[in-house]
Amino acid sequence: MKKTVVLLLLVSTSFLVWGQKKDFNEIVKFYGFISNDASLTTRQSVSVREEVILVLAPKPIVLDNNGNDINKTPSFNFTGINSRIGVSINGPDAFGAKTTGVIEGDFLGISNETKFNFRLRHAFLKLDWEKSQLLVGQYWHPTFIAECFPGNVSFGAGAPFNPLSRNPQFRYTYNLGKVSLSATQLTNGHFTNKGAEDIQKNALIPETHIQANYKTDNFIGGIGLGHKILRPQIVTANNYITKERVHSNTVYAFSKMKTTALTFKAYGIYGQNNDNLIMMGGYAALDKIYSQDQINKGIVEYTTYNSLSSWIDIHTNGSTFMAGVFAGYSENLGATKKVDVSTFMGRWDNVKDMMRIAPRLVFVSGKTTIGTEIEYSLANYNKGNPAGSTQEEITGYDAYGNVTSTEAADNLKFILNFTYYF
């Protein structure tokens, strides 16, 4: 205990001596924003924290006893829980590198039960050498490109068409002039895949990504590839250890180009089991002939669902006024092997595809912005037919989990946002 106290005093003294040589504002910087939204939706929606703040998709058609659509009910809300605060610290050099530490949070909590509570967003340190960088801690998932994401007024950066996740990770980046290469290993954190809480931890191997970027003054583009392993169970319902795992791959590409008048952004991702990114995806048990030993022990094998998502975002460049539009599309491509659809774990297996288009206007004065946006979303949900003559007609799914019979549900969201940055 005494040794720990002495060590802390030595570190604190060293930091204070170093800090005296620099202005406090050069060392510690507080930043963030105070944001408040007024939102109106024409339909009940799947949303984050049930605050109409991050509307992901319109809810499906559900009829009451009179044949009226229950979810065709509008809602309105004021909220400011996405307000954010962070601190960035430029510390003394370490291991021959410049050091930076960041802690950032907001008030969304990590579930509906904890909304309005403080939530950790980022908590990382960076070691910057001349040509390379090591980032350790919680930061954006590699599929989320901090220099190329939608500029929506609505909170959520284009989710579920754009990945949205922050994860504990190790990320090493090497710079080759205009080209940079990075490798990342990460775990889920509180952005988890559906299923058991420790579904990734028990797989033992972190999710791994590699990425290559090309950047100039007015352009950035890149490609990336990721691999993830999950272990849905460690013991079966019949009390036998099972070691079955789910392997999934993701590939993505992005670009951003800036001209004098306009900025163009585009992104596309094809992947498996990406529900931890708040996107379509998941896994299910294989529909196959199992051995008698597997049946006796209750062991099942799994496969992933595939999905495709893409978006474009265009906006004008201005210091006091910007107009823009976002358009996104996602499609559920089912599995490559036959599955038992009743065992699916993930997001939106009951949706064939979904789209969104959202024009916006943003007014800027000093550190204050006023933004308004109209967001139209549509999702084609599974619609089975109990009177059908085949299993596919009855359930609305084929043997590979593809949705074959649909009905559309759509929603309009109107938003007015006031934000003060500091």
What is the predicted function of each stretch?
Residues 406-422:
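Outer-membrane beta-barrel "beta-signal"
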Residues 44-49, 113-117, 146-154, 191-200, ...:
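Outer-membrane beta-barrel translocator domains and adjoining extracellular loop/strand segments
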